């Protein structure tokens, strides 16, 4: 027996949920051994670019050669400069730039709240809205965003029951 039209509609994800699900799938491409992060840049309900965290294109993956930050016991959020990987947000911005896609005025969906490095890039890229799922404790990023005109929203996965 088929579902009624009303039942099918109630299971249909809203746009924020849909794009966050896409970001979740993108995060599965990550090659970082510490955290899998995905990002999707969207404008007018159209995906412009995606990115996940990992080593630069053509270089050995962290999963293959190890993580210096892990070996040195460096906590998450510290000493980004010795990480061989790029963040998901950085890769999404780079992909858009590489293919000549304007991202000004767009929204970025991130599986993890952006760090201060990515936040500065997102502000300068003129992204107007950041939607993230998992909080990330970076006070500088939050202060920068509070000072900017960027809208920030914590996405909470809807309860389907």
Explain the meaning of each model-derived region.
Residues 1-161:
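Zinc-dependent deaminase catalytic domain
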């Amino acid at each position: 027996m088929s579902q009624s039209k009303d039942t099918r509609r109630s299971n249909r994800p809203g746009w924020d949920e849909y794009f966050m699900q896409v970001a979740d799938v993108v995060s599965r491409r990550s090659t970082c051994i510490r955290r899998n992060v995905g990002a999707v840049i969207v404008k007018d309900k159209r995906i412009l670019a995606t990115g996940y965290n990992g080593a630069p294109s053509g270089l050995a993956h962290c999963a293959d050669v190890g993580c210096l930050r892990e070996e040195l016991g460096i906590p998450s959020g510290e000493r980004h400069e010795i990480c061989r990987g790029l963040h998901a947000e950085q890769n999404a911005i780079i992909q858009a730039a590489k293919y000549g896609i304007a991202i000004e005025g767009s929204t970025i969906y991130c599986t993890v709240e952006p760090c201060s490095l990515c936040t500065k890039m997102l502000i300068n890229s003129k992204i107007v809205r950041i939607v993230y799922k998992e909080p990330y404790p970076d006070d500088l990023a939050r202060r920068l965003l509070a000072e900017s005109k960027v809208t920030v929203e914590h996405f909470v996965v809807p309860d389907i029951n």
